[in-house]
Amino acid sequence: MSIFSHFQQRFASTQQEELTLQEYLELCKQDRSTYASAAERLLLAIGEPELVETANNSRLSRIFSNKVIRRYPAFEDFHGMEECIDQIVSYFRHAAQGLEEKKQILYLLGPVGGGKSSLAEKLKQLIEKVPFYAIKGSPVFESPLGLFNATEDGAILEEDFGIPRRYLNTIMSPWITKRLAEFGGDISQFRVVKLYPSILNQIGVAKTEPGDENNQDISALVGKVDIRKLEEFPQNDADAYSYSGALCRANQGLMEFVEMFKAPIKVLHPLLTATQEGNYNSTEGLGAIPFNGILLAHSNESEWHTFRNNKNNEAFIDRIYIVKVPYCLRVSDEIKIYDKLLFNSSLAKAHCAPDTLKMLAQFTVLSRLKEPENSNIYSKMRVYDGENLKDTDPKAKSIQEYRDTAGVDEGMNGLSTRFAFKILSKVFNFDPHEIAANPVHLLYVLEQQIEQEQFQAETRERYLRFLKEYLAPRYIEFIGKEIQTAYLESYSEYGQNIFDRYVLYADFWIQDQEYRDPETGEILNRVALNEELEKIEKPAGISNPKDFRNEIVNFVLRARANNNGKNPTWLSYEKLRVVIEKKMFSNTEDLLPVISFNAKASKEDQQKHNDFVTRMVERGYTDKQVRLLSEWYLRVRKSQ
């Protein structure tokens, strides 16, 4: 299919269809979605969730406490927002059931750059997917059911067409009232159209932004008299009115109010009756205008607190359904957000060295977390991401303990994703000769930006501490492993050999038995075994070798039982993995001839160096980054 025919087909599928009122009522009998409310249609567009049994995934089970969570494919691009999205869907579900939420404003409250606007845009896109029915010509897209009275007509409509009475709760607009008089009460003359909500054409979807106190009035919401028509109609005539307000255009759909509490309070008054009574007054002496849609608003915390603290606004506050949209607090999800942003830019194919996005995500997440008591914030960040720190940080608490201590406002402060993406833009363009990003440039750019942003002294020191105390030292360790891994061709096999030998020697040492090497026949007594074990333990600074050896041997014996008698991999036990890596890489001098970019003494050294660079490139670095990061690592190690 060509792009032209594809476009034409898509355009044709959204064009309005016309029915008689009788045909519409017959359709109601067959299909309940014909008279569905805006909330019901949004639920249809969102679709059914995927139920995730977190108990089956060790990481998710720690994050969500083994609960079954709902994930909606419609929101798959919104990472780390399960709780927030679940609350939004709950609001629509309750509103669709005709509960109190139907009369409330859905209000997204969160910090700048936290995703409120993106959520609002997504909801507007979703509501465009499901059509609704309106009386042809109605300037406020009102439902044909608005012609009927629940008390007078409800029983007949329910019996003949299966329409529940709760759907007959809207009034007629002044425009319909005038047409009805013209038709002499013959409602069969009304035609019904099937419409698709449209952001572009403002059909069932509208957006309002705050204006200046002096130049914005309620006409932005309710419309105003069209002065061009005053030659033909009196001022209070329904046909002289311009139904251009956001409430008019969003009837049977969704109205978004951006930064709602920045608007003058007088502008917000029509929202009170629109939510509670399903109608609002015009600016002229017309009858009330119906509204049967969703009101969606969002703003930052500072405006909300100012508004809430004013006692005059209590009636309004009672009509608000708050959904908090905090910053993402999981590093892995923050990385997915950066990946999404990069994918939608020209940097999608630019080189990004390993650990760059992770380091930036760790920094931004650390800035959003509240400092825990009796535990370090870096461990808290790792626990929030679902890591198990039982073997590496005994002081680390459970995710629930951290959350309880932090309170409900965690994630409402800190650095935004916008800030992070601007940092990323600078890092990718840092080198004038290569569009690429790496953690060394990231550390430099972050430090410069922290100085330039003019944060409060306490915040500035806190952010610099994150860089110097947590991120830089861990990156030195990370890039060291990357370099050393590329240096050692048989890295995995070598590590497994050390692991197997350590477990074997430790087992014999614990049992106080001599060990005879089956290949050489050499006998190692308990003293000799201890010396061999210490060669592995000392570089890692193991303070209590006896307990450590017992712990490792017990772990391996349990693992063998589930692995057909074979040893587990050397990576399977965090504590011993760290010990083995430190043993393997304790001698940096061995690396120097291979990883340095100086002239080589021999062809053999040059070949080893070339092989090292090739393996680093295979791991995701550019040639230029290999040189930069290797030289940076050697400088840092030398200074230490």
List the model feature ranges, each with a label.
Residues T34-Q640:
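Conserved ASCE/P-loop NTPase catalytic core
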Residues M1-V52, G113:
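N-terminal accessory segments that target, anchor, or regulate ATP-driven/P-loop NTPase machines
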